Amino acid sequence: MTGISLLWLWSKRGFIFISYVFLVCFAAVLPIDSIAQASQSSNNALNTFIVVGALVIFAVVCIILIVGRSLYFKSCLQDVPRRYIPSTAIDLPHRGSRELVTQGVEASKQLSTMFIKPKDPVIHPGVEPPERCDDPNIDKVFPEYLNYHSCIKNIADRFKYKGVFMSVDKNKLDIDSTFSDIVREKYIISNENVAVKQNAERLIELYEVLRFSGNPITREQFVYFVELCIYLVEHSLTHHIEEDLTKFPSNTMFSIGEFSTGLQASRIQSRYSAAQSFENDFGENLLNAQLSELLQNKSRIEEERLGRLRRLAGSINESEDEAISSSISRWNTSSGSITNSYSTVVRH
C-alpha cells in the first residue's frame, strides 16, 4: 500500500472512532440528567427506581439483540461448506486477508506434494505390514496382514488342548489348566536345565502381557514370542530324540543333528532301516550298472580287434594265422576272468 492509501485508511478509522466517542458521550447525557432530576424531586425513591429500571431494561434489550445477532450469524455460517475457502472479494473485502488465505493454500499444496509419501515405513502394531509398506532392510518372514493376536491365541490353544507345540510328544494334563500352567509344568517344574527354565518363564510373562494387556502387539514382541516357542520346541525334540537313541545298539552311527529338522522320534528306527535298505540296493544297482558298461565296452573292443585282424588276414601267412588265433584265445580267457571277478563283487 502507498503512503496516500495508508493516510486515507487511518483517517477513516480515526474519524469512525471519534464519532463513536461523541455518540456515547451524547447518549450518556440523557440517563445522567434523568437520574439527577429524579434525585432532586420530592419523590426521590420512586423516580430513581423508574429511571434506573428503564436503563436496566434498555441494557438488557441491547444485550439480547447483540447475542441474538451473533447466534444468527453463526447459524448462517453453518450452511457454508467447511472446505469452502473465502478467496474472492465478495467473501473477503479486505485484500490483505485474501492474500494471506491464498498464500496459505499454496503452502498447503506444496507441503501435500512433499509429504504425500511418508519418509519412514509405516508399521502399525497388531498386524504384519504389506511388503510395499515394510522396511526393506528387514527380511519378510511372516505373511502380509498376519494378525499377531490370533496367531498367539492359536499357538496357546494348540499347546493347551493338544499338549504340544509340534507332534513330538503327548502331555496328559488337566483340561482346566491354562497355557501358563502347562508350560510351567513341562519346562520349569519337571526340568533341570537352567536356560530352559529361564526361557519358559519369559514365555509365560510375555504371553500374559500380549494376551491380557489390551495393547496392540508389536512386531518385536511377536518375533520374540515365536523365538521362545521355537526354542522350547527344539528342546523337546532334542530331548525325545536322545531318549529314542538310547534304544539303538551302541554300534549304530547316529548323531542328534541328523534329526534336527523336525523328525518324529517314534519313526527314527523305521527310517533308519529304510535308509540301510536303500543304501544296499543303491550299491548293488551301481555295481551292476558298472559291470554292464564294462562288458559292453569289452564286446565293442573285441569286435573292433577282430575286424582289424580279418582285414589283415589276406596279407599274412599261416604262421601268423596261428599267432592271431592264440591271441584271440588269450583275450577270451582274460575277459572271462574279468567277468567272474565282477560277479563275485556283486554277490558280496
Swiss-Prot record:
GO cellular component: membrane
Keywords from the UniProt entry: Membrane, Transmembrane, Transmembrane helix
Ranges in the topological domain labelled Cytoplasmic: 1-14, 69-348
Localisation: Membrane
Membrane-protein topology: Multi-pass membrane protein
Extracellular-facing ranges: 36-47
Record-annotated membrane-spanning stretches: 15-35, 48-68
Primary location class: membrane
Function according to Swiss-Prot or TrEMBL: Required for growth under high-pressure and low-temperature conditions.
Similarity comment text for this entry: Belongs to the DLT1 family.
Protein name: Defect at low temperature protein 1
Organism: Vanderwaltozyma polyspora (strain ATCC 22028 / DSM 70294 / BCRC 21397 / CBS 2163 / NBRC 10782 / NRRL Y-8283 / UCD 57-17) (Kluyveromyces polysporus)
Gene that encodes the chain: DLT1
